[in-house]
């Protein structure tokens, strides 16, 4: 424990909180344009072809974003909305594309967890 004199001299430095989604610049979402849409393979114990897109954000930064859900309509030059949220088994993927916003279509035939995939309520 420091003495009062040491605190007078130095003071206490506040802890620096490091953001997990730096490219969003403290915004909840950011608009961007897809520059490349492709698939990648996940880390060791898992095996799949995960759909990802390289997105140039409106603030000038370029990020890799995951496309959640089954099937998508994205291609080069598609306008997308990007939110934070990493994909654990894809190194370097720290952002996700919001389904049902801008050029991204919602997931078809989605019954549960619809709001996450931009799916509207099914009509009876």
Swiss-Prot record:
Q: Is the keyword Ligase in the record?
A: no
A GO cellular component entry from the record: small ribosomal subunit
* GO aspect biological process, one term: translation
Q: Which domain of life is it from?
A: Bacteria
Q: List the disulfide bonds.
A: none
Q: Which GO terms describe its molecular function?
A: rRNA binding; structural constituent of ribosome; tRNA binding
Q: Which residue ranges are recorded for the region named Disordered?
A: 1-20
Basic residues bias (residue ranges): 9-18
The PTM 3-methylthioaspartic acid maps to 89
Which is one Pfam family of this protein?
A: Ribosom_S12_S23
Matching entries from SUPFAM superfamilies are given as: Nucleic acid-binding proteins
Ordered alphabetically, the record's keywords are: Methylation, Ribonucleoprotein, Ribosomal protein, RNA-binding, rRNA-binding, tRNA-binding
Q: Does the keyword rRNA-binding apply?
A: yes
Provide the function of this protein: With S4 and S5 plays an important role in translational accuracy.
Membership in a protein family: Belongs to the universal ribosomal protein uS12 family.
Q: Which NCBIfam families match?
A: rpsL_bact (TIGR00981)
* Subunit architecture: Part of the 30S ribosomal subunit. Contacts proteins S8 and S17. May interact with IF1 in the 30S initiation complex.
Stated name of the protein: Small ribosomal subunit protein uS12
Q: Which organism is it from?
A: Clavibacter michiganensis subsp. michiganensis (strain NCPPB 382)
Source organism phylogeny:
Bacteria, Bacillati, Actinomycetota, Actinomycetes, Micrococcales
């Amino acid at each position: 424990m420091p003495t009062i004199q040491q605190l007078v001299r130095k003071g206490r430095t506040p802890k620096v909180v490091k953001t997990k989604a730096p490219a969003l610049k403290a915004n909840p979402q950011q608009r961007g344009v897809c520059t490349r849409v492709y698939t990648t393979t996940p880390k060791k114990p898992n095996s799949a072809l995960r759909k990802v897109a390289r997105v140039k954000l409106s603030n000038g930064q370029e990020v890799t974003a995951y496309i959640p859900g089954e099937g998508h309509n994205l291609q080069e030059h598609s306008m997308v909305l990007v939110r934070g949220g990493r994909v654990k088994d894809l190194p370097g993927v720290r952002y996700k594309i919001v389904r049902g916003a801008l050029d991204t279509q919602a997931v078809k035939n989605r019954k549960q967890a619809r709001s996450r995939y931009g799916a509207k309520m099914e009509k009876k």
